[in-house]
Structures are given as C-alpha cells and as structure tokens.
C-alpha cells in the first residue's frame, strides 16, 4: 500500500504553474442575500437540473506534510455515476476514479485496480489525501449539498459553506464564477479542513 502511495504522489511537478492557475482572487465582500430568497431557490433549482456535464481544470491538495498538484477532469454521466481523472503535466493519467451507485473503482498510474464502497476512504489510503467526495460534486456546482450553514453573495450564489462530518469541519469559499453561463457555475473554489486545503479551478463547464 505504501508503494502505491509513493507511485501516486511522485507526480505533478509544475507546481508554480498550477498554483498560479489556482491563485486566490480578492472579491469585495458585499452584503449577501438571504438563503430564503426566491432568486436563490430559482438558481438552486436550475443547477440541480444539470445531471450530465463535464468540467476540467486545476487541482491542488495542500497540507503541512504533502502537496499534490494535478489537472483534473470530472465527467458526470448520470446522477449516481461519474469519472474523475487526475493527470500530470504531460497528460498521463495518475489516478482514475469511477463511481457508479455505491461501488467505486480506482486505477492508479501502474494500472492496478482497487474496488471499494467508500471512494473517499480508498483515496485516503492510497494517496494520503482527505477529499470529501460525498459533497464535493454538489460544492463544485455551487450547491450546499448536505450543509445547512451557508452564505450567499450579492448575486444569489454561494459564497461560503460550513459543514461538519465525522468530527471534521469543512469550510468552502467561492472565489469566482463563470458569469457567461446560465445558470452561473463556480470557476474557483477552496476547501479547508484543519491544515488541509483543496483548491479547484474549473476552466470550463460543458453541459450535456
């Protein structure tokens, strides 16, 4: 298992390039809108109708003990089926996760397959990364998921989310949105839990 972790974590040099891509934006903190507003519910319903899509961009997982940088490609082909690819700067796949229903399969960069009913735990064991997969898909799309503690910006979109699960408190910050789309979808988000940070920069969204 440790050798698998070393193989997966050998990856992804061009850190400075990806950190630039994932760099923080400073947004003016205007007073947010109410989560009970009609405009938010209309936006939420419009996003929830999107069940087939693809998004790609830059991924960074940062902690005191390790740093991981990658390109990512998330393909959602049904409400309960998706594929997540992490690739290195040369375009080679370092990790592929396929989730269908409760069954998850991971293929590492050596072609070794792992199957589990807990994708997040499997990724943690193989790579050392803690990723809240059960809510990540919702948060990536600008939805609160299971969280009930969240704030909106002045455009009736998510600005912050707070969520506790299994003793871990996640804080999600929305830094930018793709304003050319309707409904508007996130372009840059950051998740933090303790000393761990996950940065996601969605370069594009393709809605099918």
From Swiss-Prot:
S-diacylglycerol cysteine: lipidated positions: 22
Signal peptide stretch: 1-21
Gene Ontology terms: cellular component: cell outer membrane
Keyword Membrane appears in the UniProt entry: yes
Compartments where located: Cell outer membrane
Coiled-coil region: none
Transferase as UniProt keyword: no
Keywords recorded for this protein, A-Z: Cell outer membrane, Chaperone, Lipoprotein, Membrane, Palmitate, Protein transport, Signal, Transport
InterPro entries: LolA/LolB/LppX (IPR029046), OM_lipoprot_LolB (IPR004565)
One BP annotation, GO: protein transport
Membrane topology classification: Lipid-anchor
Record lipid sites (N-palmitoyl cysteine): 22
One Pfam family from the record: LolB
Main location class: membrane
Membrane-spanning segments: none
Function: Plays a critical role in the incorporation of lipoproteins in the outer membrane after they are released by the LolA protein.
Assembly: Monomer.
Family: Belongs to the LolB family.
Identification of the protein by name: Outer-membrane lipoprotein LolB
Organism (species): Erwinia tasmaniensis (strain DSM 17950 / CFBP 7177 / CIP 109463 / NCPPB 4357 / Et1/99)
Gene: lolB
């Amino acid at each position: 298992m440790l050798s698998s972790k070393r193989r997966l974590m050998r990856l992804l040099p061009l850190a400075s390039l990806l950190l630039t891509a994932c760099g923080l934006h400073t947004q003016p903190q205007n007073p947010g809108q109410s989560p009970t507003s009609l405009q938010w519910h209309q936006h939420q319903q419009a996003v929830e109708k999107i069940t087939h899509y693809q998004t790609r961009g830059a991924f960074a997982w940062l902690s005191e003990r390790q740093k991981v940088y990658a390109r990512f490609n998330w393909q959602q082909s049904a409400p309960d089926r998706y594929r997540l690819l992490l690739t290195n700067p040369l375009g080679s796949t370092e990790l592929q996760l396929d989730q269908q229903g409760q069954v998850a399969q991971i293929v590492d960069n050596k072609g070794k397959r792992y199957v589990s009913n807990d994708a997040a735990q499997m990724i943690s064991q193989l790579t050392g990364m803690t990723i809240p997969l059960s809510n990540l898909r919702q948060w990536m799309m600008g939805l609160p998921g299971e969280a009930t503690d969240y704030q909106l910006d002045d455009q009736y979109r998510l600005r912050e989310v707070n969520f506790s699960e299994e003793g871990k408190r996640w804080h999600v910050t929305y830094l930018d949105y793709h304003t050319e789309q309707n409904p508007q979808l996130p372009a840059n988000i950051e998740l933090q839990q303790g000393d761990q940070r996950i940065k996601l920069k969605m370069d594009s969204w393709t809605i099918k």
